[in-house]
């Protein structure tokens, strides 16, 4: 959405409506273009209570979930042999209560959970029912479980190509349920069997209430064979690495960072690249909204400004930007902002002197013909930070 304000008398109601649009339905940015003549003009302020929002612009989904959808979901859960919860960023955007309701439902049903890059933290990463992240950079067990499942319950994910791969071969034998407040995301990439265009918090709470009020019971041993197969896949230990005596591996560095900070009030942001994927794999988030990263757009230079914002909003928290050296350089001047506002953000740089993800693709697909992926002129980051009085 975007607005061009030509009349100053419309400015306050435009701002109110823009914030309503940004927060309703699937959250997203709204641009308000205020020309210079409007900036210098004066007008009476219109309070939000007096603004008549245009209904076609405020997309918030249904206010309640269809009971028939709930009954069908419970019926399929009870009949399935190999179910899985596939959870995306929509669960986080719905608010922390959505994660609480998801955990309740998972514990009742004994169904495994996998999350997207943006869904990390919706379900505790160290919980045995978590298969961690799926997709191109996900775990072996998560990807195999998605492919082999007979029931897929999509909670606020968009079936993006990093998860599905070839659409014609994606989870061919599963019944698919899709929860999404954005109607345009349903049946967009993958055809689903059942759908609800309802806020996820409301949906999951309604399902949990239905189960409790109707006395619905689930056989916890129903999926023993499924869990046995998953444990066999887990045995491959797809994220295994060996830490030697000479060089600190990035996986080890992030794992140790997690072990030393997971008991504190911590927010983690990242730049974009291999370090971002290692952070997603080895930092096990136990709470929602503690992981801030640029996924869909993949914007290098994102991490430090995001850390500054997180620290401003949470002054008592530990805020860490896990960065690669090339991505960090793209917004390095923001050290000045952090210093000026006395924000104690921590920058954790994994410096391998390469744009690692670019190099990785050049090795995999282009016969190791490297082009513009090696960074030869790097500063001493410690001295550079000190020059900003950091």
Map each language-model feature to its residues.
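Glycine-rich beta-alpha junction loops
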Residues: 34-40, 89-91, 183, 272-276, ...
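Conformationally flexible catalytic loops at phosphate/diphosphate-handling active centers
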Residues: 17, 21-79, 239
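Glycine-rich, anion-gripping cofactor-binding loops and their flanking helix/strand elements
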Residues: 89-177, 286-316, 329-332, 374
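Thiamine diphosphate
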Residues: 148, 187-189, 195-197, 201-205, ...
């Amino acid at each position: 959405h975007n607005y061009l304000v030509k009349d100053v008398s419309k400015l306050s109601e435009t701002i109110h409506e823009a914030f309503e649009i940004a927060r309703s339905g699937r959250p997203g940015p709204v641009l308000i273009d205020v020309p210079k003549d409007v900036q210098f003009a004066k007008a009476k302020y219109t309070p939000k209570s007096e603004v008549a929002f245009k209904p076609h612009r405020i997309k918030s989904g249904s206010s309640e979930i269809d009971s028939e959808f709930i009954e069908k979901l419970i019926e399929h859960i009870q009949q399935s042999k190999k179910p899985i919860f596939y959870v995306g960023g929509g669960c986080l955007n719905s608010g922390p209560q959505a994660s609480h309701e998801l955990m309740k439902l998972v514990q009742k049903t004994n169904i495994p959970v996998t999350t997207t890059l943006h869904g990390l933290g919706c379900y505790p990463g160290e919980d045995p029912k978590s298969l961690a992240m799926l997709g191109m950079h996900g775990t072996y067990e998560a990807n195999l479980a998605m492919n082999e499942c007979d029931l897929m319950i999509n909670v606020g994910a968009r079936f993006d190509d990093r998860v599905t791969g070839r659409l014609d071969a994606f989870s061919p034998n599963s019944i698919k349920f899709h929860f999404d407040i954005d109607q345009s995301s349903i049946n967009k990439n993958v055809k689903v069997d059942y759908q609800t265009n309802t806020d996820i918090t409301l949906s999951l709470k309604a399902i949990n209430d239905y189960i409790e009020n109707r006395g619905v019971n689930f056989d916890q041993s129903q999926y023993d064979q499924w869990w046995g197969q998953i444990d066999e896949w887990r045995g491959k230990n797809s994220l295994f690495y060996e830490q030697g005596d000479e060089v600190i591996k990035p996986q080890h560095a992030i794992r140790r960072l997690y072990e030393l900070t997971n008991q504190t009030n911590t927010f983690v942001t990242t730049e974009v690249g291999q370090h971002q994927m290692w952070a997603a794999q080895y930092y096990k988030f136990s709470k929602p909204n503690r992981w801030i990263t640029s996924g869909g757009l993949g914007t290098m230079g994102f991490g430090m400004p995001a850390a500054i914002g997180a620290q401003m909003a949470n002054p008592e928290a530990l805020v860490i930007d896990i960065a690669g050296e090339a991505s960090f350089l793209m917004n390095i001047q923001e050290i000045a902002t952090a210093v000026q506002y006395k924000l104690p953000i921590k920058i954790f740089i994994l410096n391998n002197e390469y744009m690692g993800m670019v190099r990785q693709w050049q090795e995999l697909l282009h016969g190791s013909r490297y082009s513009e992926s090696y960074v030869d002129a790097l500063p001493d980051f410690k001295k550079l930070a000190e020059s900003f009085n950091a």
